[in-house]
Amino acid sequence: MKRKISIQSEHQLQKQCVKWFKLQYPKMKMLLFAVPNGAVLAGNDLQRIKQWNRLKAEGATKGVSDLILLVSSGDYSGLCIEMKTIANHSKQTKEQKEFEMAVIPQGFGYVVPKTFDEFRKVVGDYLEKGEY
């Protein structure tokens, strides 16, 4: 009998990573936060468009990374983290790539971890060595 392989969603991965970070680095827990640009909006098409337009007017921007770590380390001002998963071969969108290219010259690091272990390694290396 074949064992069913559980595929982790991006939501589950991000939740696991944030929980780990807050336990591992309690003094910095307020400095890692999510940017809810990918939030699922409720309602019909017209209602969702209105909700997005309201969020956009408040500064929501397509392509901004899922998580931002506002801790300087090494030569970096902070770390932008775009969560992806191995499932479905998820890739960055055009807007996410544009955001990456916009923040790097400003002194921010940018990473795209696809597993919990990758997240732990890049965040640990970033905070401890100033590199990722």
Question: What feature does the model see in each segment?
Answer:
Residues 1-132:
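Catalytic phosphate/metal-binding cores of nucleic-acid and nucleotide-processing enzymes, i.e., regions
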